[in-house]
Amino acid sequence: MIQESVATGRRKQAVSSVRLRSGNGKIDVNGKTLEQYFPLEVQRATILAPLRMLGDVNSFDLIIRVSGGGVQGQVIATRLGLARAVLQEKEDMKQELKAQGFLTRDPRKKERKKYGRKKARKSFQFSKR
């Protein structure tokens, strides 16, 4: 079927590299199983959503390398990478993946801190008198 599809996904500071190849459903995330790295069922369901659209989740092996950011950022970055890898394999899935929002990269980033302020938008306490 396929040799191997490699794709990258990003969200905030999280970067995920996903390798998709035909196999028997083995998923490796930074040397751990998917259940060990992402313990919550909601996170695992979010990540595997693009594969579920293909049909058989157990007919592919995934090797995922993820770094940076928080857990939820890593989940969304991995989902984007997986959707892009699926798209390389089945280009006719583009409309369905796009309709679900799996191919959309969330552009929101942390706003920089400004001088004269405590944080990006929070000011120092103001005393009228």
From Swiss-Prot:
Protein name (Swiss-Prot/TrEMBL): Small ribosomal subunit protein uS9
Any GO molecular function: structural constituent of ribosome
Gene3D superfamilies: 3.30.230.10
UniProt entry keywords in alphabetical sequence: Ribonucleoprotein, Ribosomal protein
Feature: compositional bias, Basic residues: 110-129
Database matches in PROSITE patterns: RIBOSOMAL_S9
Keyword check for Ribosomal protein: yes
Cellular component aspect of the GO annotation: cytosolic small ribosomal subunit
Domain of life: Bacteria
The family this protein is said to belong to: Belongs to the universal ribosomal protein uS9 family.
Organism of derivation: Chlamydia trachomatis serovar D (strain ATCC VR-885 / DSM 19411 / UW-3/Cx)
Location of region: Disordered: 97-129
